[in-house]
């Protein structure tokens, strides 16, 4: 119902994606006592979540209208991780969207932008957990996992050594 209502108010696919971004900005709170994977149902009921949970809501809304979307995970030099989304439109390519910056840009001004100094570099595209979209069958995202080791220099720059890559599409 939510996806259809947003779609009906949108001019085209990119307008729909921006309206989904604004929906998450207005309807969900960023922050969770315990970070980590939570079900989509949990996030929808509680109207809050961490970066991955809020990205999952955005991604699911896009996929409900057959717009390709995926999770991206970045590793920061301080050791923390951050998750945001990408979605694909033929005339534009992959467009980044970080719904957690919505509090600073509630007018949608951050839509389609990413600050890599805050997000770090990408170590994973996709999350391999099945996503249950209310009454529809389970869907899952692609998974790319990298085994890596990080060493810090005196200048606090991270060096990454990628030793293995495992890919599995549509688990």
Identify the residue ranges that each predicted region occupies:
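Hydrophobic alpha-helical segments
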Residues: 14-17, 52, 66
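Active-site-proximal helix/loop microenvironment
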Residues: 49
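Hydrophobic/aromatic-rich core segments of domains that either
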Residues: 54-139
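A broadly tuned "polar low-complexity/structure-edge" signature
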Residues: 69, 87, 150, 162-164
């Amino acid at each position: 119902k939510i996806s259809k209502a947003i779609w009906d108010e949108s001019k085209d696919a990119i307008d729909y994606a921006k309206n989904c971004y604004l929906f998450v900005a207005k309807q969900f709170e960023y922050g969770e006592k315990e970070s980590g994977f939570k079900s989509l149902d949990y996030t929808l009921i509680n109207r809050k979540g961490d970066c991955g949970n809020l990205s999952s809501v955005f991604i699911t809304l896009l996929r409900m209208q057959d717009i390709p979307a995926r999770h991206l995970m970045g590793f920061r030099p301080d050791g923390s991780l951050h998750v945001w989304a990408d979605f694909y439109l033929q005339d534009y390519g992959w467009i980044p969207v970080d719904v957690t910056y919505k509090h600073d840009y509630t007018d949608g001004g951050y839509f389609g932008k990413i600050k890599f100094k805050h997000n770090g570099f990408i170590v994973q595209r996709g999350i391999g957990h099945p996503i249950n979209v209310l009454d529809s069958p389970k869907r899952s995202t692609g998974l790319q996992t990298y085994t890596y080791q990080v060493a810090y220099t005196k200048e606090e720059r991270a060096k990454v050594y990628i030793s293995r890559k495992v890919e599995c599409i549509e688990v």
